[in-house]
UniProtKB/Swiss-Prot annotation:
CDD domains: M20_ArgE_RocB. Keywords: Arginine metabolism. This is Protein RocB. Involved in arginine degradative pathway. It comes from Bacillus subtilis (strain 168). GO terms for biological process: arginine metabolic process. One of its GO terms (molecular function) is hydrolase activity. SUPFAM superfamilies: Zn-dependent exopeptidases (SSF53187). The keyword Thylakoid does not apply. Transmembrane segments: none annotated. Induction: By arginine. The gene is rocB.
Length: 566
């Protein structure tokens, strides 16, 4: 879409037109469409008069070794004066797939046809009502988050045409692969550091427009999130004692152990962090299966299990300690049950007892590797060889395979559970009460929100953590070097598959703010964005915030960068 097509429009019309155009182009994660979408975004920006005059202010960055040739798109606007203060706008350009649209796949990216379809859709009154109102735009990516890109593109145009109102700089970036491995934002870290060094930029904050949604029925609040929740993927390799089903009472079934662990962890709200006023989620099971590939009458040898764990204020080490404790409880109860079942069995069958051990050992990966080293085994070599020999496996299965190979080398073939971390890992970050920079940022954003609320009638509420996964997690780091080292020691093959540049992120230390587009049903076929707020109010809120930030900050106020030990 060229500048000439939107130059005559008012600001809200520009955002709507850009959103519809962006939605119409498929950019499903893990497809070449992500590269096509990046090219389109670059084409839009380069058509703006400012960038026609400053073509070097728009550029792309290829994602290293990417099979889909994806890229980041950057655009830089230098405001009036010589300020180095800079606000970052960022958004992800990929979407989830369209399989959920079923027979409507052909119109998954057609906003008008979907609105027409849902206006006749009688199976969900809320969806039908929204479609009939004309205030909602439907389509894959409409809310997550093509409209978010459109808001940034419209604000780029606004500031490029009103440089006198911009007392600093704006740096825009559109990133691919947020819905999977976050390779876009991770690649951008080096570029952000390059710009920081070469242009002597002082990054004040990064504003993400990832979608916000009602937290309960009738919720009209617009939430502003001043930090990002993190994510861990704790994995459990469970090794049992295989037996024929005719001797089942003598075995230790890894599925039994797995079930005991899952029953204690899955959706257990009592294990969730307690952060006042925040939407905090408990662990949830994402994968649970044994190693059997076909039918036979043997019990399983091993089971693989992993969970999604959001982290808010906890560290990876604290989470590992908690999971070890829960797993040990599960194993002790399993041992007792198996022993009781066997005792009752031999009593009923009037059989002599065998001398069986019901012990189940529990290790963190760090503990298990140390045990193997003490027995003269080189675990690092085994892990490296396994990763190289299994590059066809997806990352999590490669990790499980490495643990299985380690178990084969272990002279102790008793039942055991080995806990480790696998990708993806997203750091958490938030504004700290003891940081002058963070408190100033909180104050400035609140001023901008209050001003916008006064002129629009909207109600804004601040939250500490964006409750879902977002690229903003990778822009600053709260963990100390010691805590990061503890995480890496429990992550098999980090030196081969670990992609997070911790030191470079620490150099940036950019606060992440989410001022999102507003909508419903993200990742569902009924996904839709609310036009009155997203197209009319949100661009103004971000403009106000940008100007307030650039006016309020001075170079004498510097970020308290973590030193790595604490």
């Amino acid at each position: 879409m060229q500048y000439t097509k939107i130059s005559h429009m008012n600001p809200a019309e520009r955002v709507e037109a850009l959103t519809a155009s962006l939605v119409s182009l498929s950019s499903v994660n893990g497809t070449v469409g992500e590269g096509t979408k990046a090219d389109f975004i670059k084409e839009v920006i380069t058509s703006y008069p400012y960038f026609q005059e400053n073509p070097s202010h728009v550029w792309e960055q290829a994602i290293p070794n990417d099979p889909y040739k994806r890229k980041n798109i950057f655009a830089f606007i230098k405001g009036h004066g010589e300020s180095r203060n800079t606000v970052i706008y960022h958004a992800h350009l990929d979407t989830v797939g369209i399989e959920d649209f079923g027979p409507l796949k052909d119109i998954a990216f057609d906003c008008e046809k979907l609105a027409e379809y849902f206006s006749r859709y009688e199976f969900d009154q809320d969806v039908q009502r929204d479609a009939k109102s004309g205030e909602w735009m439907f389509g894959r990516g409409s809310v997550d988050m093509q409209s978010g890109i459109a808001v940034h593109l419209a604000n780029l145009l606004h500031f490029s045409e009103n440089l006198e109102t911009l007392p600093g700089n704006v740096l825009f970036m559109a990133n691919p692969d947020e819905e999977s491995q976050h390779s876009g934002i991770l690649a951008s870290i080096s570029e952000l550091n390059r710009l920081k060094k070469e242009k002597q930029l002082h990054y004040l904050a990064a504003i993400n427009t990832d979608f916000i949604t009602p937290l309960y029925d009738g919720d009209q609040t617009r939430y502003i999130y001043t930090g990002a929740a993190g994510k861990l993927l704790p994995c459990f390799y469970i090794y049992g004692r295989e037996v024929h089903v005719g001797d089942t009472l003598a075995g230790i079934d890894p599925n039994f152990i797995s079930s005991e662990i899952t029953s204690r962890l899955h959706n257990n709200i009592h294990l969730a962090e307690k952060v006042e006023g925040e939407l905090v989620l408990p662990p949830s099971c994402l994968y649970q299966r044994d190693n059997k590939e076909s039918y036979n009458v043997q019990t399983a040898v091993s089971t693989s299990l992993y969970f999604n764990c959001f982290i808010y204020e906890r560290t990876a080490k604290e989470m590992m300690d908690l999971l070890i404790e829960v797993t040990e409880e599960a194993c002790r109860e399993t041992e007792q049950k198996l022993s009781d079942y066997y005792e009752e069995y031999v009593k009923r069958a009037n059989l002599p007892k065998k001398h069986l051990s019901w012990g189940i050992q529990v290790y963190s990966l760090e503990q298990y590797l140390e045990k193997l080293r003490n027995r003269g085994i080189d675990p690092e070599q085994c892990i490296e060889q396994t990763f190289k020999a299994n590059e066809h496996l997806e990352l999590r299965m490669r990790c499980f395979q490495a643990i299985e190979e380690l178990q084969k080398l272990d002279p102790d073939q008793g039942a055991k559970v080995i806990l480790f971390y696998a990708p993806p890992y997203l750091p958490h970050n938030y504004l700290k009460e003891d940081s002058a920079r963070d408190q100033l940022l909180q104050h400035v954003i609140k001023e901008a929100a209050d001003k916008t609320a006064e002129s629009t009638g909207e109600t804004f509420v601040f939250k500490k953590f964006f409750p879902y996964l977002a690229d903003g997690s990778f822009l600053s780091l709260h963990e100390t070097d010691g805590e990061i080292d503890s995480f890496i020691r429990n992550f098999p093959g980090w030196n081969m598959i670990g992609t997070i540049p911790f030191k470079d992120i620490r150099k940036l230390n950019i606060p992440s703010i989410n001022m999102g587009v507003y909508g419903k049903d993200g990742h569902k076929w009924t996904e839709r964005v609310y036009k009155p707020y997203t197209f009319h109010v949100l661009p103004l809120l971000i403009q106000q915030t940008t100007v307030h930030l650039l006016q309020s900050y001075r170079m004498t106020i510097t970020a308290k960068e973590p030193k790595g030990e604490g």
